[in-house]
From Swiss-Prot:
Species annotation: Schizosaccharomyces pombe (strain 972 / ATCC 24843) (Fission yeast)
UniProt keywords, alphabetically: Cytoplasm, Nucleus
Superkingdom, natural source: Eukaryota
Nucleus among keywords: yes
Lineage: Eukaryota, Fungi, Dikarya, Ascomycota, Taphrinomycotina
GO cellular component, one term: RNA polymerase I core factor complex
PANTHER family referenced in this protein's UniProt entry, alphabetically: RNA POLYMERASE I-SPECIFIC TRANSCRIPTION INITIATION FACTOR RRN6
GO molecular function: RNA polymerase I general transcription initiation factor activity; RNA polymerase I general transcription initiation factor binding; RNA polymerase I transcription regulatory region sequence-specific DNA binding
InterPro entries: RNA_pol_I-sp_TIF_RRN6-like, RRN6_beta-prop, RRN6_HB, Rrn6_K-rich
Signal peptide span: none
UniProt name for this protein: Uncharacterized protein C3B8.11
Biological process annotations from GO: nucleolar large rRNA transcription by RNA polymerase I; transcription initiation at RNA polymerase I promoter
Record's subcellular location: Cytoplasm; Nucleus
Main location per the UniProt record: cytoplasm
C-alpha cells in the first residue's frame, strides 16, 4: 500500500512503512545486505513485492534473512497459500533481483496481509458484497410541535442475537459530532504521536422502528424536506418520515424522542418480478424522485404521488451500455464480449446533480444518462480486463460534476465533463483485497479527503486531494486512522472536527483541525465512535460536542501550566483549569499542588501523611471521578507510616520507585520538574524521573523491601491517576496490564492508544530510531539522511552502503492536458458537446516522482521569429 515518493528512486536502499504504521525495519542496500552491523533487533518478518500485477508475496529464503522478535513465530510456507498467490509469488521472486526497492511488513501486520493475499472466494465468509452500508447519518424533519429544531440522527441496522431478526434502530446524533478549537497558543502538546479517544456514545431505544425479513442492504437519508429514510433489503424498500419531538415545548434543552412513520412500501416481486433490489438512490434536491436497481441490472426512476408512486423511466444496464458504446468513437475504447455480458457482477445506479442525470456502473463500465425528452447515453469510464470497479462516490462533492472511482488497483478522481480522462489517480496497492470501500469527505472546495478501508482487516488509509491553480494535486501521504485489524468492519463514516472561533458554528469555514470523528460498525455487532488525531500539533485543542439545539455536553481539555510560578501565572492557571460548566471536571497537578501546598506557617511544605490525607478530600470535590479506582495513600501507610517533609509534589513522586508510565503511555517519555517548583515544561524527559531509584530523605531506618507489591501497585495507581487527569483524561479506570483486550474495550476508557497496540515491549536499533524520531503519520517530514555509523561513505554511487534518504514531497503539481472547466448554473453547455474522443495521454499517478526541471511537462521551445 505504500506510495512513498522513494518508490520511484532507483539504486537507493529504501524502506516502506506500509499502512503508515509506526514500526521498525532493517535497512538493506540494493544488493540485499544489511546496512547495520547489529540485526538482532530486526522485527520485520515478512516481505511483499509491489509489481504491475499488484501486491504479491516474495519468497524470503531466496533473498533475505528475516529475523523475528518472537522465537516461536514461524514464517508461512508458500504451499499453504492459494495456487494463484503462489504463482504470483514465484513471478515476483524471479523479477525482483533487478529492483532496488524492498518492502517489509512488521510481524504484527502479517496476519492482516495474509488475508489480503487470499482469493475473493475465501473472503465471502467475512463480508457480503451486496450490503452497501449498515448505518447512515441524516437530519430529522421539524415536527409541528417543534418547528425550529433540526437534529441529526443515526439509523443503524442490527441482527438480533436471540431471534436472528433484522432490526432497524434510530439514535440521536449527540455526542458524535465534535468540533475543535485551540484554547492555548504556542504551547507544547503532551502527546507527540497520533492518538485517538474511544468514546461510549450511542444510546438506542429498546424497541426497533422496523423488522425486516432479509438483511438490510442500504440505508439512505434524503437531503430535502421532509426528512425521509430509505431502508432497502433484497425483497422490500420501506420509506420512513423521521421527526424529532421535544417532550416539553417550554424547555428546549429537555430530551426529545425520535419517531419514524412508514410512508411507502415497494416489493421486488411487484416491480422486478423474481428479481431482487440492489441499491436505491434519492434525488439530491427533490425528495419526490428516487431510483432503484435490480440485481440483474434493471434500473427504474420513481416519483412520489399523493396516493402512491409512479414509474417515470426505466431501462436495463445492457441496453444503456449498447447505446453508450454506439455513441462513443470506435477507436476510443477496446472491450471484450465477456465484459458486455459479465457473470456475477453487481449493478449500481445513483443520481448526479450537475446535469440532473443518472450514473450507472458495473464491474467494467461507468455510464451517464442525461434525462430529457430523448435520453442521452454516454460512456464515462472503462477499466482494463484485469481491473474491476468496486465503488463510485459522487456525494458531498464541492464541484458537482466530479466524482471518485474505487477500483481494485487505484482511486481515480474523475469529472463528468471529461470522460475516460481521470484528473488524478492514486494506486492503493491492495489489489488482492476484494472488500475495499471508500468514504469521501469534502471540507471545502479545495480539500477532499478519500478514506480507503478494508472490511476484512479494518486498515484505513486516507488520501488528500486538492487543486492548485485549477490543477489536481495530492500532496499528503496516506496515513493510518484506525487499526482494529482483528475485527472486520461493516460500515465506516469519517467526519472532520471543525474549528470554531465564536459561538456561531460555520461548516463552510476553513478546515485546519487535525481531529476526525469516525463511527464504525464492526462485525462483532458493536458500534463505536473514535476521535482521531492525524498528527501531532503545537496547539492545545478543546473538543466540544454539538447537538441539534444545545451547545456543549462534554469537554476534553488538555492543560499545560506555565513554567513561571509567580502568583499572577498561578492565577491564570487556576482560571484555565476551572471548567464549571463542563460535565467532566479535570484534575490537574497544578491545582492539586495549590491545594496541598497551602501556606501553613508561611512554609510551603507538606508531609507525606498530609499528602495522603488531602488526596481523598480533594478527589471528593469532583463528582465525575470514579472513587473505586482511587486507593488513598492513608490506607497504604496505616501499617507503615512514613515521616517526612516535602516541598512539592515532584519530591513525593521522586520517592516512588518507577511508576512505569512508559508502559501505560508508550510515547509519554517524561516530564521535567524544576527543583523549586513542580511545574513541568515538556514531555521529553519523563524517563529520567520515573526511573529514578528510591532515595529516602526521611527516616534512614525505613527500608524499601518492606513495601509489599500491592502497596507499590496502589501508589502507582494514584500517581497514574494524577498524570491522566493532568493531561485531560478523566472518568476512567486505571489501565491494568493483566486485563484482556476484550475487557479493556468494555471499560469506559478515555486514553491515548498507540497504533497496533502490543503488550510486548519493542527494542529498536539505531537505524530505526533515526527513522521514527522525524516521522509522523499523515505527514512526510523534512528531508533527512539516515546513514550507517559504522561505515563512512564518500561516494553514494560507488559505496556499498549508500545513504538512505527520503525527499520531501509536500505538493506535486501534475498538469492535465485539459483543465476542468467549472460552468455557472446559468450557462451550462450542451452535455453531448462535452464528450470528445478520449486522449491516450498517460494518467498522472501520484506514487511516482516527477523529476526534471519542468516536471512532467515538456521543456519550453523558443518561438520562431517571423518577418524580416
Amino acid at each position: 500500500m505504500s506510495t512513498w515518493p522513494i518508490d520511484a528512486i532507483s539504486k537507493k536502499p529504501s524502506v516502506s512503512l506500509d499502512y503508515g504504521i509506526i514500526g521498525a525495519c532493517q535497512l538493506l542496500n540494493p544488493s540485499g545486505y544489511h546496512r547495520a552491523e547489529k540485526v538482532e533487533n530486526n522485527e520485520w518478518t515478512f516481505a511483499r513485492y509491489d509489481s504491475y500485477t499488484g501486491v504479491e508475496l516474495v519468497d524470503l529464503d531466496k533473498r533475505w534473512d528475516i529475523l523475528s522478535l518472537n522465537p516461536n513465530y514461524k514464517l508461512p510456507k508458500l504451499t499453504e497459500l492459494p495456487a494463484e498467490a503462489t504463482n504470483s509469488t514465484r513471478k515476483a521472486t524471479s523479477s525482483s533481483f533487478g529492483l532496488s526497492v524492498c518492502r517489509y511488513v512488521p510481524r504484527n501486520l502479517f496476519s492482516t496481509l495474509a488475508k489480503e493475499s487470499q482469493l475473493a472466494s475465501s473472503a465471502e465468509s467475512i463480508y457480503n458484497p451486496h450490503i452497501l452500508n449498515t448505518f447512515c447519518l441524516g437530519k430529522t424533519a421539524p415536527s409541528d410541535k417543534n418547528r425550529y429544531t433540526t437534529t441529526e440522527c443515526l439509523a443503524c441496522s442490527k441482527i438480533s442475537n436471540e431471534t436472528a431478526e433484522n432490526l432497524l434502530f434510530l439514535c440521536l446524533s449527540s455526542p458524535w459530532i465534535f468540533r475543535a478549537s485551540p484554547t492555548l497558543q504556542n504551547t507544547a502538546t503532551f502527546e507527540e504521536f497520533p492518538f485517538y479517544l474511544n468514546v461510549s456514545a450511542f444510546e438506542f431505544a429498546e424497541d426497533p422502528i422496523w423488522k425486516f425479513s432479509q438483511p438490510v442492504r442500504q440505508l439512505v437519508f434524503s437531503n430535502g424536506e421532509p426528512s425521509l429514510l430509505f431502508a432497502l433489503s433484497s425483497c422490500e424498500l420501506v420509506i420512513f418520515q423521521v421527526t424529532y419531538d421535544l417532550m416539553f415545548l417550554d424547555e428546549p434543552n429537555t430530551p426529545g424522542c425520535l419517531s419514524a412513520i412508514p410512508l411507502r412500501f415497494l416489493y421486488a416481486d411487484d416491480v422486478y418480478n423474481s428479481d431482487s433490489f440492489a441499491n436505491v438512490s434519492v434525488h439530491p434536491t427533490d425528495n419526490s424522485f428516487f431510483l432503484t436497481t435490480s440485481s440483474s441490472g434493471r434500473w427504474t426512476i420513481w416519483q412520489f404521488l399523493d396516493d402512491g408512486y409512479r414509474e417515470c423511466f426505466g431501462s436495463s444496464f445492457k441496453e444503456s451500455l449498447q447505446q453508450a458504446l454506439c455513441s462513443a468513437p470506435t477507436s476510443s475504447i477496446a472491450y471484450h464480449e465477456e465484459e458486455i455480458n459479465p457473470d456475477n457482477t453487481i449493478y449500481r445506479a445513483k443520481w448526479e446533480e450537475y446535469f440532473g442525470g443518472v450514473i450507472l456502473h458495473n464491474a467494467f463500465f461507468i455510464l451517464h444518462v442525461s434525462l430529457g425528452e430523448v435520453p442521452d447515453f454516454h460512456l464515462l469510464f472503462h477499466c482494463s480486463s484485469d481491473v474491476r470497479i468496486l465503488q463510485v462516490v459522487n456525494e458531498s462533492m464541492p464541484i458537482k460534476s466530479e466524482f471518485f472511482i474505487l477500483t481494485t488497483e487505484s482511486v481515480l478522481w474523475m469529472d463528468i465533463q471529461h470522460p475516460q480522462k481521470p484528473l488524478l489517480e492514486w494506486k492503493h496497492n491492495r489489489k488482492l483485497d476484494p472488500t475495499l470501500k471508500i468514504t469521501v469527505t469534502a471540507t471545502f472546495s479545495q480539500n477532499i479527503y478519500v478514506s480507503v478501508y478494508s472490511q476484512m482487516n479494518g486498515v484505513v488509509q486516507q488520501i488528500h486531494f486538492s487543486k492548485d491553480r485549477a490543477l489536481p494535486v495530492s500532496g499528503s501521504h496516506p496515513f493510518l486512522l484506525l487499526n482494529e485489524v482483528q475485527v472486520p468492519i461493516r460500515s465506516l463514516i469519517i467526519q472532520p472536527c471543525y474549528f470554531f472561533e465564536s459561538s456561531e458554528f460555520d461548516r463552510q469555514g476553513p478546515f485546519d483541525s487535525p481531529f476526525w470523528s469516525a463511527i464504525i460498525d464492526k462485525a462483532d455487532g458493536s458500534l463505536s465512535l473514535h476521535i482521531l488525531c492525524e498528527k501531532s500539533s503545537l496547539k492545545i485543542y478543546n473538543l466540544e460536542e454539538l447537538t441539534g439545539s444545545s451547545q456543549v455536553a462534554m469537554k476534553f481539555k488538555t492543560i499545560t501550566p506555565s513554567v513561571n510560578t509567580s502568583e499572577d501565572d498561578s492565577a491564570n492557571d487556576q482560571e484555565i483549569i476551572s471548567t464549571p460548566n463542563s460535565d467532566f471536571q479535570q484534575l490537574s497537578l497544578s491545582r492539586l499542588y495549590h491545594v496541598l501546598c497551602s501556606n501553613r506557617n508561611k512554609k510551603n511544605t507538606i508531609t507525606l501523611d498530609e499528602f495522603a490525607s488531602k488526596v481523598p478530600d480533594f478527589v471528593e470535590a469532583f463528582d465525575s471521578i470514579n472513587h473505586d479506582v482511587i486507593i488513598t495513600l492513608s490506607e497504604l501507610y496505616d501499617g507503615f507510616p512514613l515521616k517526612g517533609t516535602f516541598t512539592n509534589v515532584a519530591e513525593i513522586i521522586s520517592h516512588l520507585e518507577g511508576t512505569e508510565l512508559s508502559f501505560y503511555f508508550p510515547y509519554m517519555f517524561g516530564i521535567n520538574y524544576n527543583n523549586a517548583s513542580f511545574f513541568y515544561t515538556s514531555v521529553d524527559s519523563i524517563a529520567s524521573l520515573i526511573h529514578r531509584r528510591w532515595e529516602s530523605n526521611t527516616d534512614k531506618s525505613v527500608e524499601i523491601p518492606c513495601f509489599q507489591s500491592s502497596q507499590r501497585r496502589s501508589i502507582k495507581n494514584v500517581i497514574h491517576y494524577l498524570f491522566l487527569s493532568s493531561i485531560g483524561v478523566s472518568r476512567e479506570k486505571i489501565f491494568d496490564p493483566s486485563l484482556s483486550r476484550k475487557e479493556i474495550d468494555s471499560t469506559d476508557l478515555l486514553t491515548f492508544i498507540k497504533p497496533f497496540y502490543d503488550t510486548e515491549g519493542l527494542e529498536l536499533n539505531e537505524d530505526v530510531r533515526n527513522i521514527l524520531e522525524n516521522w509522523e503519520i499523515g505527514k512526510i517530514s523534512s528531508t533527512y539522511v539516515i546513514g550507517d555509523s559504522a561505515v563512512e561513505t564518500e561516494d553514494p554511487s560507488s559505496s556499498q552502503f549508500s545513504d538512505f534518504y527520503i525527499s520531501q514531497q509536500q505538493s506535486s503539481v501534475l498538469p492535465s492536458s485539459q483543465i476542468a472547466t467549472v460552468f455557472s448554473q446559468e450557462d451550462v453547455p450542451n452535455f453531448s458537446s462535452l464528450y470528445s474522443e478520449s486522449s491516450s495521454q498517460t494518467i498522472p499517478i501520484m506514487s511516482q516522482v516527477v523529476s526534471g526541471k519542468y516536471g512532467s511537462r515538456p521543456s519550453k521551445k523558443k518561438k520562431k521569429r517571423s518577418g524580416f
